[in-house]
Amino acid sequence: MDLINSLLNFVVPPASLLMLAFTWPTLFFITTCEWLYNTYLNSENMENKVVLITGASSGIGEQIAYQYAKRGANLVLVARREHRLRGISENARRLGAPNVLIMAADVVKEEECRRFINETINYYGRVDHLVNTVSLGHTFYFEEASDSSVFPILMDINFWGNVYPTYVALPYLRESNGRIIVNASVENWLPLPRMSLYSAAKSALINFYETLRFEVKNEVGITVATHGWIGTEMTRGKFMVEEGAEMQWKEEREVHVTGGPVEEFAKQIVSGACRGDPYVKYPSWYDIFFLYRVFAPKVLDWTFRFLLTNGGARRTSFIGTGRPLLETSSPRRSAVMEGSSPRRLPPGPLTFSPAFQQQKSE
């Protein structure tokens, strides 16, 4: 057996690469034809369908809501910051959404997920797309974290905050032959410093949905969206740091990476979901790093060591401070995140994000 495995280890990788090189043009042609057909002839009509979006109070979730609104979908917007949802719901109505429900809820609690799913069914009678966008990152070296109580919070938000809504909504998605859209990240396989726990949670998330894809077969579609470095709250300060506080991001990473527009990523996600794409990748050129990780891991290791180290002492450079991420009396009780403690605020003035103003003028 050892001899056979040794032989296969030597023969299979180069033979597979050679076969892939010969079949790639044909596969690319087939994929392109499918994309054209699904884009122009078979794209799902979202008019009057029901789309539930978690983490809809900012960033990717907000922009996805606007994209579905332009397609005439009925929306259910879920987040902890209800005051933000009010303005976003008005923006969505102006962009074409016939009806918009907003609900304050914590997606890491199964009972609250059950509540907003049931309220959606009671009001609309169905749910067609479930869009999970909740996410929370961090910017610390794992060994330098001063409080390990933040570790479960990262897993709660990035993993269970997606799993619980999916678990509750799945029977209704089967009835409507609906779709689940997942906000993941290339960091599930691309090693970046200061993001170890976030990357681990995203890896668990993608493996969960890849397995679920086979379990639900063709009854429920699943679109996994992976993004590189884009301009969201996570790149503008919405991070968990060593001291357990929300702080403005300035220079946590050792290398500057240009962020792509979140509006474009949201547009690609919705278009891909309506086409029935299993994956949406933005930007797609990140895929090349995956090939290097599988077939030439040393090259990837050398590249990142060169790009992501500064040769000096580790540093964390912040400007400003925010509300406490963890309360002293209960270290896991709250986090400044998409899903912070349910604090009802009085109605404020209607807010319109700059991105909405730009979309409205187009």
Swiss-Prot record:
Residue spans crossing the bilayer: 10-30
Keyword DNA-binding among UniProt keywords: no
Pfam families attached to this UniProt entry: adh_short
Keywords in alphabetical order: Lipid droplet, Membrane, NADP, Oxidoreductase, Signal-anchor, Transmembrane, Transmembrane helix
Gene Ontology terms for molecular function: 11-beta-hydroxysteroid dehydrogenase (NADP+) activity; 17-beta-hydroxysteroid dehydrogenase (NADP+) activity; estradiol 17-beta-dehydrogenase [NAD(P)+] activity
Membrane topology designation: Single-pass type II membrane protein
Binding sites annotated in the UniProt record for substrate: 185
Active site residues of this protein: 198
Main localization (coarse): other
GO cellular component: cytosol; lipid droplet; membrane
Binding locations of NADP(+): 55-81, 198-202
Function as written in the Swiss-Prot or TrEMBL entry: Has dehydrogenase activity against corticosterone (11 beta-hydroxysteroid) and estradiol (17 beta-hydroxysteroid), with similar activities to both sterols in the presence of NADP(+), but negligible activity to either sterol in the presence of NAD(+). May be involved in signal transduction regulated by various sterols.
Family recorded in the similarity comment: Belongs to the short-chain dehydrogenases/reductases (SDR) family.
Protein name (database record): 11-beta-hydroxysteroid dehydrogenase B
Organism: Sesamum indicum (Oriental sesame)
Organism classification: Eukaryota, Viridiplantae, Streptophyta, Embryophyta, Tracheophyta
